[in-house]
């Protein structure tokens, strides 16, 4: 069994449903300390939601003048769902038919193990490496993400820690290992809209104002609006409604209020304030009495095809003979926090097809190549 597969299995065996770390970071920290890393554990959050974060760094021969490449990821996993639907216990790593099964196998304990073993090999092969290697690991990525990467980035910024490159181990591959790198993510802007009407008996509509009827033209306008055209990196901004509720449940009462939950996934062509203004303008033009509670989940970020993306693409090509695709599709990630303090941020990891699913798994034969890709990226950028 390879060192990477062995460590992956050890991490999967840790029960680490958000915000629990389950001992994963201790395993990682001990391995890194053994090869000269300074490590720091930071616990954050309220008593009923304690988050564990790990910061680790090993400087190179160039000291503070050297480039810094950071591996970032999370040890927490989503809940298992019904245990009886799993073919094997989700926290007992199991190999069947060339697949390694277990919660977190794809998202993202295989990547974490590959980070560690790639770093061990790199340090052994390049003891005089010029640049620095860092790790930022949290147990609060799958949850609210209030006490994880975001606060660690604030700490790093406060201590003026420079970061040049960051590789996040999210599962980005689609059909085969190496076919996709995420070099950016769309922003997320959510809102809870309340449209006010006047409640009345349904037989006397002249005594009420039905917010469902009143809002219909505005809803149509919102759905039909082209918010932007996107660009070479991003698809056009999308607007989606996720929940609509009105009424008391009785069928003879005109509702007094309509509530709509909605979300923008937006490109770098739009700013949050522009989207807010345009949406509110549509509602005002429709003559609606409304209020909105806005939540900005994250701003979009993009890393062009520069040094980091180039090195990773070359490493993938060497290891897998695949010409990889750069993409910004999908949901948000902790990259939205890291991009504020790091010049170049990309995400790359194993196949994403089983993430968060029953019988989550990775291809066993992908584990060592993934580790090799990470090591070859280090060799190009900080050796």
UniProtKB/Swiss-Prot annotation:
Recorded catalytic activity of this chain's protein: N-succinyl-(2S,6S)-2,6-diaminopimelate + H2O = (2S,6S)-2,6-diaminopimelate + succinate
Pathway: Amino-acid biosynthesis; L-lysine biosynthesis via DAP pathway; LL-2,6-diaminopimelate from (S)-tetrahydrodipicolinate (succinylase route): step 3/3
Named cofactor requirement(s): Zn(2+); Co(2+)
Key word Cell wall biogenesis/degradation present: no
Cystine connections: none
EC numbers on record: 3.5.1.18
Active site: 76, 141
Membrane-traversing stretches: none
Pfam families in UniProt: M20_dimer, Peptidase_M20
GO terms, molecular function: acetylornithine deacetylase activity; cobalt ion binding; succinyl-diaminopimelate desuccinylase activity; zinc ion binding
PANTHER family: ACETYLORNITHINE DEACETYLASE (PTHR43808), N-ACETYL-L-CITRULLINE DEACETYLASE (PTHR43808:SF31)
Assembly description: Homodimer.
Family of the protein in this entry: Belongs to the peptidase M20A family. DapE subfamily.
HAMAP family: DapE
Protein name as annotated: Succinyl-diaminopimelate desuccinylase
Species for this entry: Polynucleobacter asymbioticus (strain DSM 18221 / CIP 109841 / QLW-P1DMWA-1) (Polynucleobacter necessarius subsp. asymbioticus)
Gene (name only): dapE
